[in-house]
A protein has these predicted regions:
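N-terminal membrane-targeting/pre-transmembrane regions
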Residues: 1-39, 115, 121-123, 133, ...
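Non-transmembrane, membrane-adjacent beta-strand/coil modules in membrane-associated proteins
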Residues: 60, 76-140
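Transmembrane-cytosolic junction motif
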Residues: 56-72, 76
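Short hydrophobic/aromatic segments of transmembrane alpha-helices and their interfaces
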Residues: 49, 56-57, 127
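Hydrophobic alpha-helical transmembrane segments
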Residues: 38-49
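Structural signal for membrane-spanning alpha-helices in multi-pass inner-membrane proteins
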Residues: 27-31, 53-60
């Protein structure tokens, strides 16, 4: 049973993907209109490969789900192929933080640890007993912080 579960949509990722789709569709139509069949034969395979690549990235990173149980914090991106778990017993501390804009989104090595994020700048930072730090992006920093604190108190 989960004591906390929340899925944050990757709003920025979705918006940027939509923008890229529009740009590629308009660009493709213009190139086909100006270049005819010769251009179509050269351009369409590239467009299809780019569309497939974009679809894979969106499927993998369109959201971040955080589940907290008595035993662990479980993260999963998008369709669930990319996951990470943190046993509650391994966590030393938790605090709310605000990421800088240049930390970006996705899974990133940042100064002092790792970041797991799909949208926005708010996060919690957990420090493990082995001194490693991880930031988990969220649009519910207070609720997520309270849920982790509750799980930590329950494990003591």
């Amino acid at each position: 049973m989960h004591e906390y579960e929340h899925t944050q949509p990757g709003t920025f990722m979705r918006a940027m993907t939509g923008l890229w789709v529009v740009i590629f569709v308009v660009g493709s139509v213009v190139m086909l209109a100006l270049g005819g069949q010769e251009v179509a034969g050269a351009v369409i395979p590239g467009i299809v490969m780019l569309a497939v690549f974009t679809a894979i990235i969106v499927a993998l990173f369109h959201s971040l789900t955080v589940r907290i149980s008595r035993s662990d914090i479980a993260l999963s991106f998008g369709v669930g192929l990319i996951r990470k778990r943190f046993p509650i017993g391994d966590i030393r501390s938790v605090r709310t933080v605000r990421n800088r804009w240049y930390n970006g989104w996705g899974i990133r090595k940042i100064r002092g640890g790792w970041l797991y994020n799909v949208s926005g700048f708010d996060a919690i930072e957990i420090q493990l007993k082995n001194e490693r730090k991880y930031r988990i992006g969220t649009d519910q920093p207070k609720k997520l912080f309270a849920a982790v604190e509750s799980a930590l108190a329950g494990s003591s």
